[in-house]
Amino acid sequence: MRDVYGVAAFRSRQQVLRFESVLRQRGVPTQVVTTPRDISMGCGLSVRFPMERLNDVRQTLMTSNPGNLIGLYRAEYDGTRLRVAPA
């Protein structure tokens, strides 16, 4: 089973929680998750979102200017391995 999703990684937990809240207010399904190991920096938490909503997430980043963003990533789990690449 293949699971593909987006990850927004930040340097601070406070920014993760703020950005997750803003996305939810805009109707984007989100979840606070442990940051994947391939994204080695940050606070250890990230915001998970559906890849279909990547454009909404990018637009929200531009308008909310959360700061401390490490990056947006595409994560794909194929049942045995998680692969992470810049989105």
What are these regions (language model features)?
Residues 1-3, 86-87:
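Short, low-complexity, intrinsically disordered N-terminal peptides in bacterial proteins
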Residues 4-63:
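Amphipathic, hydrophobic secondary-structure cores in small proteins
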